[in-house]
């Protein structure tokens, strides 16, 4: 089977809509984040090389490089999310006849749950990185595509929120209270920072449209 990140839009949506549980919400979140990164790249590409934006070319080139890196990372995370979900589900098929088998199965489920929470946590972090780029691009990018920058930010925050729920659903299965507390704290900070960034970039965009 082809990597999910290599499928056409139509093929990916068909996979997402199928009865198979993966790709699911996590993969959809990663793809939304990748779309946000692509929009950020578009804004940067429509700014670079234009004489009237020469004073910010160096900055925008750096933002473009970062956006492209996040796009690649998020596409990779589409596949990683499906892989860890499938691995997690396979743990429930492990034998559970003897006490030793039951203990090994329980340990495998907990370890797989932690991986199933780690990948969407990485999706959330990467989506937040894209949101930060969008926040800068609505200021430094070509004003003719400022709304595309805003759309990048909105998609990135939506991707982060979707990833959040995919983290939370797995936390109760890890049985690692310290790890869960750190993951929850990381998410809380990301969400608070993302809300502030989105508010700011939308205010900049709305002002430009007046």
What are these regions (language model features)?
Residues 67-74, 120, 127, 187-190, ...:
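Amphipathic alpha-helical coiled-coil segments
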Residues 42-54:
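Transmembrane signal-anchor/signal-peptide helices with a preference for the extracytoplasmic
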Residues 4-23:
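Short, hydrophobic/aliphatic alpha-helical segments
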Residues 18-41, 145-163:
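Conserved phosphate/anionic-ligand binding catalytic regions in large, soluble enzymes, centered on
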Residues 2-7, 198-210:
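Accessory "access/gating" subregions that flank catalytic or transport cores
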Residues 130-133, 145-205:
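Preference for long, well-ordered alpha-helical segments
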Residues 51-90, 197:
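A structural-propensity feature for long, helix-poor, extended segments
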Residues 81, 85-154, 158, 170:
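Amphipathic alpha-helical interface segments
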């Amino acid at each position: 089977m082809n990597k999910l990140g290599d499928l056409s839009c139509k093929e990916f949506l068909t996979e997402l809509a199928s009865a198979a549980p993966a790709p699911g919400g996590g993969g959809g979140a990663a793809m939304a984040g990748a779309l946000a990164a692509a929009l950020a790249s578009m804004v940067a590409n429509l700014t670079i090389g234009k004489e009237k934006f020469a004073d910010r070319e160096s900055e925008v080139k750096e933002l473009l490089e970062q956006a492209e890196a996040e796009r690649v990372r998020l596409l990779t995370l589409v596949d990683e999310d499906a892989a860890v979900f499938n691995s997690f589900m396979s743990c429930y098929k492990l034998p559970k006849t003897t006490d030793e088998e039951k203990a090994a199965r329980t340990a495998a489920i907990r370890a797989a749950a932690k991986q199933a929470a780690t990948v969407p946590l990485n999706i959330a972090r990467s989506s937040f990185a894209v949101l930060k780029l969008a926040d800068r691009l609505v200021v430094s990018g070509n004003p003719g595509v400022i709304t595309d920058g805003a759309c990048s930010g909105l998609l990135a925050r939506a991707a982060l929120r979707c990833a959040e729920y995919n983290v939370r659903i797995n936390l109760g299965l890890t049985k690692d209270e310290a790890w869960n507390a750190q993951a929850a704290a990381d998410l809380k900070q990301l969400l608070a920072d993302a809300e502030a960034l989105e508010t700011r970039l939308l205010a900049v965009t709305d002002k430009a449209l007046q």
